[in-house]
Regions:
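Solvent-exposed loop/turn segments at secondary-structure junctions
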Residues: 6, 12-16, 103-107, 132-135
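A structural signal for short, well-ordered beta-strand segments and their strand-loop junctions
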Residues: 5-10, 99-100, 127
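A substrate-binding/cap region within the structured catalytic cores of diverse enzymes
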Residues: 1-90
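C-terminal regions of proteins
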Residues: 82, 88-91, 95-98, 105-166
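N-terminal start-of-chain detector that recognizes signal peptides
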Residues: 70-71, 98-101
């Protein structure tokens, strides 16, 4: 049985909530020092920042106030840094470490792999994207190649429009 609470606890994805709130308000400067160091070693370029901002805005059904977007991006970077740190810790024994996460966290151009390449350039990464047919990422070409080394395209999942109830 899938236990997302276990995953959230292992990677500390949910918090502590006060840290996430502080980062949303104050940016990476409010992050714990070890995670701030990872974020600072792997700064986002303007293209990646704009892409994350767009995804955050669209992912919140266009309802996210513009002034909150930079803080939400900082929280996304905090989660990515936390996952990168967990992977580096897990790989210290010399064996492989795996991250199974949403595509926003596994993109090579703006998420955990980008951070790992900066803070641990000698590590070998294999970045697999699993995306739904019909999404921008599912289109083979230069954009997909920047994001993943292996791309698996699946049929779209049946779901209600989450924005319809807003």
């Amino acid at each position: 049985m899938w236990r997302s609470a276990w995953v959230n606890t292992c990677f500390d994805l949910e918090g502590p909530h006060e840290t996430l709130r502080a980062v949303v308000r104050g940016g990476a400067a409010a992050a714990p020092p070890e995670l701030r160091a990872i974020i600072e070693q792997a700064p986002l370029d303007s293209v990646a920042r704009a892409a994350i901002d767009r995804e955050l805005f669209e992912g919140h059904c266009g309802k996210l106030p513009a002034e909150m977007v930079p803080g939400m991006r900082a929280a996304q970077e905090l989660r990515d840094a936390s996952m990168a740190e967990a992977l580096l810790t897990a790989a210290k024994g010399g064996g492989p470490a795996w991250l199974i996460a949403g595509d926003g966290h596994v993109r090579a151009d703006m998420a955990v792999p980008r951070m790992l390449r900066r803070v641990a350039p000698g590590k070998t990464l294999l970045i697999v994207g699993v995306v739904e047919r019909g999404t921008e990422a599912a289109v083979p070409g230069p954009e997909a190649a920047r994001q993943y080394q292996v791309l698996i395209v699946t049929p779209p999942a049946a779901r209600e429009d989450p924005c319809a109830s807003l």
